[in-house]
């Protein structure tokens, strides 16, 4: 760079735009995969009911794993419009609706765990064996325990399922059900709609691949070699 003669070439090199890497696919489960995974905990045991309620809440609310870990008993608001109060990044709170089945699980869980006392409203909603608030790692471990049984039912279930894949799955399922990106943005707590648009891009690509796999392409893209057509060449020459 100290030689003026090489400066022009150096400028050309740094002016070459970087190759844009393709956007990675959003890792998520299909509705069938999610349904099978959520059905794995043993409903006949206290631990199984706790795990099922935890995973169903994670999926139904589309919350981040830390938001799930931070839930307090008071954050489950029942009534005519049942909602879950989530505390996200920067301490910002948002309310997401609870569907009927998820609400029923939470209500039974709160009663079974004796958390329905007024003085327990600030208790952590989900705790470990030591009655301490579950950590992100603890939640990840709980989910991992049910992957192998789920794969025995449906081998297509991924070998690794993370808590964040529950959030991705909920967003994709909402989008595929026709819910607008604006609502999904607010539901997930995104500040920028561009963050939410990754789901739309992923869904479009999945549809394209599905169409390619399902239907033969009937359009023949091969064109005749016009350079061998003498009459066409004569006509083109006459246009000069």
Where are each of the predicted segments found?
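Conserved catalytic core of the tyrosine transesterase superfamily
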Residues: 1-240
């Amino acid at each position: 760079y100290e030689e003026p003669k090489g400066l022009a070439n150096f400028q050309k090199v740094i002016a070459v735009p970087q190759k844009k890497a393709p956007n990675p696919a959003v890792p998520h489960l299909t509705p069938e995969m999610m349904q099978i995974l959520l059905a794995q905990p043993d409903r006949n045991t206290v631990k199984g009911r706790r795990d099922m309620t935890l995973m169903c809440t994670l999926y139904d609310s589309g919350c981040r794993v830390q938001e799930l870990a931070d839930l307090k008993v008071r954050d489950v608001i029942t009534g005519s419009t049942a909602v879950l109060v989530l505390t996200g990044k920067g301490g910002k709170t948002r309310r997401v609706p609870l569907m009927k089945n998820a609400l029923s699980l939470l209500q039974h869980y709160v009663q079974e765990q004796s958390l329905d006392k007024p003085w327990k409203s600030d208790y952590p909603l989900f705790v470990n064996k030591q009655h301490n608030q579950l950590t992100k790692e603890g939640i990840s471990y709980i989910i991992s325990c049910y992957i192998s049984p789920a794969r025995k039912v449906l081998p297509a279930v991924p070998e690794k399922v993370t808590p964040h894949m529950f959030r991705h799955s909920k967003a994709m399922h909402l989008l595929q059900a026709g819910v607008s990106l604006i609502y999904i943005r607010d539901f997930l707590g995104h500040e920028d709609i561009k963050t939410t648009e990754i789901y739309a891009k992923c869904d479009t690509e999945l549809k394209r691949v599905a169409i390619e796999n399902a239907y033969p392409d009937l359009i023949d893209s091969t064109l005749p070699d016009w350079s061998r057509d003498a009459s066409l060449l004569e006509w083109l020459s006459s246009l000069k």
